[in-house]
Design a protein with these regions (language model features):
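Flexible glycine/acidic-rich beta-alpha junction loops that bind and position SAM and/or redox cofactors
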Residues: 24-25, 81-86, 116-124, 136-175
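Short, hinge-like loop/turn segments at secondary-structure boundaries
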Residues: 31-33, 129, 158-162
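Catalytic cores of alpha/beta
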Residues: 55-61, 119-137
Length: 175
């Protein structure tokens, strides 16, 4: 399937599973394949958890053609109370170290995501999250707003957090 995109010189292919690299062998297999079959045009976009990247993964991607891949890393927040409350596991210090290591190769575009409106996140802690992410110098810092999806944990907790959000897609938090 990847070869089809390469043969047809598709400009960009996105892997939108934010846990793409949680299966180490699978990620390595795909990255090796696209490196070996690089057509010089197609860019592959991966959403991943940076803090679980292993050294051999970093070494492999650091040796790729500039522009062959780009990484989207969903930080969401660096406020530990927020991260705990939304049931995420993330070591931001490790994320920052890995993003910095990858940046040193000057071949991989990285963008890190933050979300406004999360539990226990106020203006000051959001500013701190912004500063923390800004300091690691990703090529792009993407800001999004919390969306309260039907059936999600946040929808079940909406009264506890006093969430007011749009009742039509994309269900963004208003306040």
């Amino acid at each position: 399937e990847l070869q089809f995109f390469l043969d047809h010189k598709v400009p960009q292919v996105k892997f939108v599973d934010r846990t793409f690299n949680c299966r180490h062998d699978h990620a390595m297999e795909i990255w090796r394949y696209i490196k070996e079959h690089d057509n010089g045009i197609t860019n592959f976009h991966f959403e991943l958890a940076a803090d679980v990247l292993k050294d051999d993964e970093i070494e492999l991607i650091s040796d790729m053609r500039p522009g062959l891949i780009q990484l989207e890393i969903g930080v969401q927040s660096t406020n530990i109370d927020t991260i705990t409350e939304i049931h995420r596991k993330m070591d931001f210090k490790k994320v920052a170290d890995i993003v910095t290591r990858i940046n040193a190769g000057h071949n991989i575009h990285q963008h890190l995501d933050l979300i406004a409106g999360l539990p226990y996140e106020d203006l000051e802690s959001f500013k701190q999250s912004f500063q923390d992410v800004y300091e690691v110098r990703p090529e792009q810092l993407q800001l999004g707003f919390l969306k309260v999806l039907k059936g999600s944990y946040m929808e079940k907790q909406k009264e506890n957090y006093g969430l007011v959000y749009k009742d039509t897609p994309p269900y963004e938090v208003l306040y």
